[in-house]
Amino acid sequence: MDTTFGNGECEMFTSPHQKFCATQTSPSNMKEPDEPGVALKNGQGVHFDYHMHPEARKDSESTVVAGESHSEMPISSNGHNGTIAVPEGYGANSNGTSNKKKKKKSKKRHIDATINDPDAEYPTSRVIKQAPNGDVIVESLEDEHHDHHSNLSATIWDNSTIEEQEDLKRFWESLEEPEKVKLVKIDKKSILDLFRTFSSNQQGGQPTHHSPASSSTSLAGTPHHGCTCSSCGRRSSIIEAELEMIYDNHFDDIIDFIHEVRDIKDLNALPGLLFGGFHMLEEEHRMKKTRARRRSTDLQPQTRISPITSSTDGPPEPTTTSNVSTPSHSESVSSPSPWTNAVAGLLEKFLQENPGASWNKCSQLFQEIQEAGNQVNPGNGSSEGSDRENDDKKTAFLKDFGEMISGGFNDMTSGKQEQFHENFANGIHKIANDFLNNDGKSFVEMVEALSGSRSERADLLKSLQEIEDHSNQQEQPGTVREQIEELHDEEPVIPEDIQNQPKEVVGQYVDQRINQLSELRDRLEEEYDYDTYDDPEYDNQEYDEELSDTESEISEEEKMQEIRRLFLIQVIKLFQERLKNAYKEKLSQDRTRRLIEELEAEENAKKEKELKKLKQKEKAKEKKRLQQVAKDEERRRKEEEERAREEELRLKQEELRAEQKRRKEEARQKKEEEKRKRIEELRLKKEAEKKKQEEKERKERELKEKKERESKEKEEREMMEKKEQLKKEQQPKVEQTQEKPQAPPSQTSQSNPSVSDPISSRQDNSVSSLDPTHDLQNAISSGLEQLSLGQQPMSHISSQPSQSISQLPIQPPSQPFLDMDQIRSPVTAPAMPTQAQMPQSARGSLWGQPVNNFSPFSEGVWGSRNNSIWGNSSMSGGSIGSGTMGSGTIGSGTIGGSASIWGSQTPTLANTTMGMGLQSGINGIQGLSLEKENGSASIAGTPGNSLPGNSLPPISRNSLSGNSIPGSIPSSIPGNLSGSLPGNLSGSIPGSLPGNLAANSLPGMSPSMSVPLPQPFPANVDNEMIRTAAYQAFMLLQNSNQLEYGLAAAVKLYQTTILVLSMEVSFSQFLGSCRDDIESSYRFDYVYDDYGAVSHIKASLRSSLWN
């Protein structure tokens, strides 16, 4: 047997090649086979099992999913669903496109089948199709046409088991209020989808009117499998058009009605409403509307619409009839009520056949009673009072019977089965009493008026095909056509979900949809009776008149009542589906949750087992680890002991080395301390001697100054007395001269030289007191003059204290300090006087010689502080300058031997003579050490030398003033010096120098020579200046990255300080000035070397004066 499942394809089964197992089963007791295979159901009582070979069964399991060796999918056969398990190689998962592949796969699987019931008839002509959702559908092809009017089964809810209904009720009660409201929420789209789904399922269950080939060629992807004939298509179009019109015009009224019906009970009563209770509610609502309408209208006869309910569906179905009276109707008024007889017969039959009936049977009885009552329409001859009375009694009967059924349902759902039977029996007696108390008169007119409805409906059903054929040629009303088209064209929304439900539910759902379509068809037949238009003589005008008369008979209220009832049915079904779907979803979630819990439990059990194994392994590892730890501890203990012994030995050796080092260090420090003490003692001794010498010099200087001051005062007094005497003597002469013409000023000044001399002498003295160079020149000139005159040097001069130029202020207050470049610039002296201008004795000796490059401000003159001419050092062995005093010799004796006074590389006065005259000596003085600027030589010689007896004492400032140099010639000059002078020199120098020479020192000297000289470094220079220069030098070294760990080398800092200060300072004086002073703004930290000498210095600013 060749089969193909997938892609909507189907094949005919004409020759079976397998054996089948066919057993007569019912849908309720049908069970799945114990072994995996294929289960197909065809019809109501035949069950086919396709079993696999035992060898092939090893590769599969009893329960499989799609994509594995087998796949299960729901199937539908003639309106019933089942389950098919398709082996691998068949169905949707098969890729077989040729018979060879299929045969190979069938050989591998070894599929065998056996027939348990050979007498069962096997359908040789059938079609197996695949639905769009993958379902397998088996259809028989024996009959060419399906029956349009198949037997209608009970609804989903009426055939539900007690357990399912109880579960649904419990599920509804467990829902929260928002969830309940969401389930009962009504919208237009949901109801419209229900109608379309109903139409699709109804057409899918009906057969077609053409050959079987057309059915097999229907598309598998279409949403339904309905008939495609022109009659069915037009009918569906009409129905859909009518529904669309109803939605557009009456949707709001319908929704209000549905809400009114739904709100009669609270949400907790919804299960009872869904399981049949809504019949009573709808009927009660309809009766109330009828009574209200009758009270508001007159006594004229009106057309009423009585509900017609099918025998298999719960909701009532509307049916309209004509109000034309017939003779049979008038005769039936006096006859017994057929509804009474029918109800009595139904009750009696029910009690006999169902002594222990279930609730479902009671619901069917209630529907039959309703159907019996709805099939009878009261006649037009009855009065308004009788109709109202009949309606009230009928309403009371239906209400009592509905309450009894609802109470029975509540008892059954709560588990009170015995109480249900008791209540049902009591309810039957109550209904019977109420029914018999009307004496057959309550419902006579109502039932007899409706007696003709059943026969009329039967006739309409028989002529349905003729009406459909006739409706193809006639113009149908737009509303009905649109309603049919809407149900036919729209795609179903629910069928795929319903097909996944159990087979009993799906079958009931399909039957319900068939019933609804039948009701719509009955409405169409009843509203439009085309039999009256079959007469060819019936023209269009008569048709229009009769149609208008019929429409006028049906009031708008009755139409709305029918529409409301129709929509009420759909809303109830919508509620049912929603509740069922929600319940299924909850069941699925619960199962999923339980499955997850089971999986978690299994996983936890596995984890616990693994954890136990891990614990055992951990224990074993821990035991091994403890053993290893013990071994490691023992090994570490031994190593620690070994290290402790080695450490103890090492400490002893270090102590010995430290002790030896300490002893050496103590010895070294002791030596250094002794050395420092000796140095300090020598320094203190020198300082004491220096202080004594300075004190002695100071006293001598003060004494000399006092004598000079007294002599000056005496001279000034004498000068003043002389002036006063001269004034007194000259006053008569002045008076006489005033009478005479005044003489020129030049003559006056020449005539009184004595008056101007004292003033000029005082001016010269004042100038000379400010110009050390002037004093030096006067001293030299006076000394030479005395030497030339052969005067003996004064011995007492050496004992007089000399005033050092170092005691002069660093900078005179009246003028700024001279620039060093200006000081070092050579000075060009004016031309010396000629020999004609000089005295006869001085010609050719001193005058007339050129003066070359004399500058007393050269660096050679002002050397270092230790070699300074202004210090207290001796002048032993020094010469006057780097140049010679003259070409001739002064005598056989020398001044100071061969040592140089101004430099170390200049000729001395030892071998020079004064024969060349005074001019040559002046030239030598003017050329003092200009070429040598190294500052290594000085007039004072090396430091520390004492003054010998024959050395020149320091030249005093006061001794250099005036026109003469008293006592300026030192006593150390040998006595034979004066005798060695040539005679012409002693005779050529006058006793007193000319006035211009006395006032301006030596002739040829520039007037600019009288400016104060820069001193190298006075003894009492400010220490703060040295500190400032030292700090600037430290910052320069720091900016040039010449520091060593933030410290500057002492020697390098000293050299940089000398450059910044532009003065010569000794290293000891530099260190002494930089020592910490609490009043200074700078702080200097010293670092000493191993011998106690300062090696490095760190300079910083003080944060405060008291830091």
Curated annotation (Swiss-Prot):
Q: Where in the cell is it found?
A: Cytoplasm
- List, as start-end ranges, the regions of compositional bias called Polar residues: 298-313, 745-775, 935-949
| Compositional bias (Basic residues) | 99-110
Query: Gene Ontology terms, cellular component aspect?
Result: cytoplasm
Q: What keywords are annotated for this sequence in UniProt?
A: Coiled coil, Cytoplasm, Stress response
Classify the source by domain of life: Eukaryota
> From start to end residue, where is composition biased (Low complexity)?
207-226, 321-338, 791-809, 958-967
The UniProt entry lists the main location of this chain as cytoplasm
Q: For bias kind Basic and acidic residues, which ranges apply? A: 605-621, 630-738
Q: Which residues form a coiled coil?
A: 508-733
- The region called Disordered is annotated at 21-42, 57-120, 201-226, 286-338, 525-556, 605-775, 791-820, 935-967
Entry similarity comment: Belongs to the NST1 family.
The record describes the protein's role as: May act as a negative regulator of salt tolerance.
This protein is called: Stress response protein NST1
Q: Which organism is it from?
A: Meyerozyma guilliermondii (strain ATCC 6260 / CBS 566 / DSM 6381 / JCM 1539 / NBRC 10279 / NRRL Y-324) (Yeast)
